[in-house]
Amino acid sequence: LYDGAVHIPMASIDGMADRTITINSISKTFSVTGWRVGWTIAPADVSGAIRKVHDFLTVGAAAPLQAAAAAALASPASYYTQLA
């Protein structure tokens, strides 16, 4: 896949972890559109502001979808690569 090119996450580059905000979702990663379950990974000094904005812009995801998302994230990498 991708002619052998390997993805290098921005946050893994020296000096970038404290300057990177990673945003992801189950909808895109596992092809379950409409679930609206996602997350961010950010430095502590930024994540507080993200949580404040999130409180006013979104509603909570249904509990069964959160449980399904946790199960999907715990799946082996082989499951994910089969989706590609």
Model regions and ranges:
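Rossmann-like dinucleotide-binding domain for NAD(H)/NADP(H)
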Residues: 8-12
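Catalytic PLP-binding core of fold-type I/II PLP enzymes
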Residues: 1-6
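Conserved core segment of the aminotransferase class I/II
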Residues: 13-84
